[in-house]
Design a protein with these regions (language model features):
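C-terminal transmembrane helix and the adjacent membrane-cytosol boundary/short C-terminal tail
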Residues: 140, 186, 192-196, 235-273
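Membrane-cytosol interface at the C-terminal ends of specific transmembrane alpha-helices
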Residues: 78-79, 86, 90, 128-178, ...
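Transmembrane-helix boundary motif in ABC transporter permease subunits
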Residues: 26-27, 74-107, 120
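Periplasmic/extracellular loop-to-transmembrane helix junction in inner-membrane transport proteins
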Residues: 1, 34-77, 226-242
Length: 273
């Protein structure tokens, strides 16, 4: 247990440092979008650690600025998805009946399509842009939380303390807010963390396909797409943004996995009680 605490603490500290570096990237690197055509496709050097792109822009600056935008969007998307999924999953799991059947039907429809294809279809209908990206990924993301919350609520609502609360005349709304939702928080936290990394990759994938954040706003997927054209002349245009993206997503996933392991024993104890 002590080793797990130490490992989780290290993961958390490094994660916070990485996030702070991204958050303040605009102050650290304030000129990421400035064009310097005379310096285009320069190899990594002391002046440009990641080299420059085809327009002479510093790749280190653009990569960190792009990561900041992707992480901010991922956080917004997951907060919206979590709020919607928690409400829908709680109502479906607690009340059952028509609400639950309707939820299951919608869930089956949404999950029958690959998420990337569904996202492309929504963006094709709504148009590209940051707002559309948030709408499209949120409309698809809530199902993950709703399914998790519903499964937890189905178990919790049959517990003795919920039955006892009902017997003293407590309203369904009170029970949901006071007793059910607080007991769903633990499994949701690691899921939320893992989905942040998943969403960052989804944003980058859509950007690579040309359906994500549009230029001149820096975005990792679009930067990698631009680098494909110059892969033989300037491989650093793909190597450094792709590597940094992988490192951030890997660290988020490691933190999410460790949080899931951390909360699992607590969940088992609570259920046994």
């Amino acid at each position: 247990m002590k080793d797990r605490k130490r490992y989780l603490l290290i993961l958390g500290i490094v994660f916070i440092i990485l996030i702070l570096f991204v958050v303040f990237s605009s102050q650290i690197f304030p000129h990421g979008n400035q064009l310097h055509m005379a310096e285009s496709l320069e190899a990594p050097s002391g002046e440009h650690f990641f080299g420059t792109d085809n327009l002479g822009r510093d790749l280190l600056e653009r990569t960190f600025n792009g990561l900041k935008i992707s992480l901010a969007l991922a956080l917004i998307i997951q907060l919206i998805s979590l709020a919607a999924g928690a409400v829908i999953g709680s109502v479906a799991g607690y009340f059952g009946g028509i609400a639950d059947k309707l939820y299951v039907m919608v869930q089956n429809v949404l999950m029958s399509f690959p998420s990337i294809i569904a996202s492309l279809c929504l963006i094709a209908m709504l148009g590209t842009g940051i707002r559309t990206l948030i709408i499209a990924l949120s409309l698809l993301g809530w199902v993950t939380y709703a399914r998790l919350v519903r499964s937890e609520v189905l178990i919790i609502k049959e517990s003795d303390f919920i039955m006892g609360t009902k017997s003293i005349g407590a309203s369904n709304g009170y029970i949901l807010v006071k007793h059910v939702l607080p007991n769903v928080v633990r499994p949701v936290i690691p899921m939320f963390t893992l989905m942040i990394g998943h969403t960052v990759l989804a944003i980058s994938g859509l950007g690579f396909l040309g359906f994500g954040i549009q230029p001149p706003t820096p975005e990792i997927g679009m930067m990698i797409k631009d680098g494909v054209t110059y892969i033989t002349r300037a491989p650093w245009m793909i190597l450094f943004p792709g590597t940094l993206l992988s490192v951030y997503v890997l660290w988020i996933n490691l933190l999410g996995d460790e949080l899931r392991e951390w909360f699992s024993p607590i969940e088992e104890i609570n259920m046994n009680e």
